[in-house]
Each structure stands twice: as C-alpha cells, then as structure tokens.
Amino acid sequence: MAEPLFLQSQMHKKIWGGNRLRKEFGYDIPSETTGEYWAISAHPNGVSVVKNGVYKGVPLDELYAEHRELFGNSKSSVFPLLTKILDANDWLSVQVHPDNAYALEHEGELGKTECWYVISADEGAEIIYGHEAKSKEELRQMIAAGDWDHLLTKIPVKAGDFFYVPSGTMHAIGKGIMILETQQSSDTTYRVYDFDRKDDQGRKRALHIEQSIDVLTIGKPANATPAWLSLQGLETTVLVSSPFFTVYKWQISGSVKMQQTAPYLLVSVLAGQGRITVGLEQYALRKGDHLILPNTIKSWQFDGDLEIIASHSNEC
C-alpha cells in the first residue's frame, strides 16, 4: 500500500526544557520542562507509532523489523536515524558523543553523529561548538581546572542556521534556542560539564570525563557547506550529505511534483500548511507533522506553502 506513514511520538522531560514545544507547534507536553520531542524514532527509549492507514498503531521499530520492504530492504539492523525537536530553555550540558566503534564496544548501540537546524533563537543566543585545547593532555588539564572560559568555543546563532556535529565534537545548545536535530539512532551522551546545577531532587547529574576524553576530537569542527537549488515552486537546500545521512530543507510554494530518489524519506513540517498527494489520495499537512515516505511511494505532489526538513540514511 503506497501511503505516507504519519507518526505519533514521545516527549521527554529535561532539566533544561521549557514549554515552547506547545507554544510553537501546539503539542500536548507533559510538563513545563519538556525538552525533547522524538518526532521520528525507533529507538527503544522513545518509539514512534504509526497513526494512519494499514499500519495504524504499529510501533516504528516493529514495522522496520517486520516490513523491511517499506524501507528499501535496508541492511541496517536497526532503524538508523532519529529526528528530534529540542527546546532549550536553559543550556544543555557540555557533551560529546562517541563514534560507531566506541559506542558499539562500550554502550552496545550506534554512535552519534548529528546535525542541527535552528528553528528559532532568542537575541544573543549562543551554542558551544568545539574547544580550544591543542592536545588530549591539555584538554584533560583544562577540564580538571574547570577552565571553561578558555576551553569552550562559543558562537552566536540565529533562526535558519545549520550545524553539522560529528561524533567527537564538544558541543552544547544554549538557552533560548529551538532546533530540529537529525541524528544517528543513539541515546549515548557523555557529559563533560553541567554548569554545577542540580535537578529537582537536589542532585547533580553524572559526568563522564574519562569517556569524554577518550572520544573527543582535537581540532576545530568543520561545518557543512549547504548547496542551494531553486526550481519553480521549490527551493531546495542540501544542508549536509555525510556518511550517515543527507538532510534537505524544502521551501514549497504552490504545487510541486517530486520523485523518490532514496530508499525512504523522513519528513518534518516546520512551518505552513498544505497537502501531499500520493496516487489518488490526499493527506493534509500542517506545521508540526512528522511522517515517513516509504519505498512503496515512488512519486508525490506537495501543494501549499510549506517549510520542510527531509532526510534519509546513507547507511542502507
């Protein structure tokens, strides 16, 4: 059956979260400190569920395991990607993620390379993107001394910015920023620094200094260089094409016909409204929708005014 898979997904409370997932997208959030919406996920810590069509009610991990034909008969043992929206009402911890080899050996799951599309950012908002240490020994010394002002590289951000964050990159999302994150399907994070804050039980969150030093990369991160193409009714920006995923921004105005060029596509509507037509069937689209266009869909048409982030795995 050639139909898009619309998804219902899980919210995650975070010490740094807020309520902008409700304000911006109208989502039903569980608390005023909701930090993450795992919009397209088959990770066991937050599995999305199909909410329409033949597979209504089926969890995405189960669908991937039992109907691999929907995903181009992908050879990846697990659904390889995870799409999130993050609301940073405060700084996230300064952190780093391992690569596949380290994560599989030590954590039993994929590594975590990710990327961020900035949906909104307060005036003066910043991220941490890299560090100033010239060696692992200097890195260890600066962490031990708590010399964060000299170690951490801060840069200002605004809505529409994009950052590629390979495994091994020291990073943190700053206060007042909302992002859409495309990442490998992993929940492994090593915290380097958490601003000495305490949770609602008065406890500090665990740090992972030795693991962080093991996996951190020395040298400045190299951000992706987006490529832009305009056709009638469609502006396409290839935000990044990496060994793990390719991510696009589609700005749609009017009617646009498209072809499936990947085994399947992950689609997130960040703004606007419209519809997608597959064969003879039409499906409404609105801001905050997340869906998968499976391999059974070879072509479709978008109508309306829509801002979309789409992605596909490159590990199929």
Curated annotation (Swiss-Prot):
CDD domains: cupin_PMI_type_I_N_bac. It is an enzyme of class 5 (isomerase). InterPro entries: Carb_Metab_Reg_Kinase/Isom (IPR051804), Man6P_Isoase-1 (IPR001250), Man6P_isomerase_Firm_short (IPR014628), MPI_cupin_dom (IPR049071), PMI_typeI_cat (IPR046457), RmlC-like_jellyroll (IPR014710), RmlC_Cupin_sf (IPR011051). Zn(2+) binds at Q95, H97, E114, H171. Its EC number is 5.3.1.8. Transmembrane segments: none annotated. Binds 1 zinc ion per subunit. GO terms for molecular function: mannose-6-phosphate isomerase activity; zinc ion binding. Keywords: Isomerase, Metal-binding, Zinc. One of its GO terms (biological process) is carbohydrate metabolic process. It holds the Pfam family PMI_typeI_cat. Its cofactor is Zn(2+). It catalyses: D-mannose 6-phosphate = D-fructose 6-phosphate. Gene3D superfamilies: Jelly Rolls (2.60.120.10). The active site is at R191. NCBIfam families: manA. Belongs to the mannose-6-phosphate isomerase type 1 family. This is Mannose-6-phosphate isomerase. The lineage of its organism: Bacteria, Bacillati, Bacillota, Bacilli, Lactobacillales.
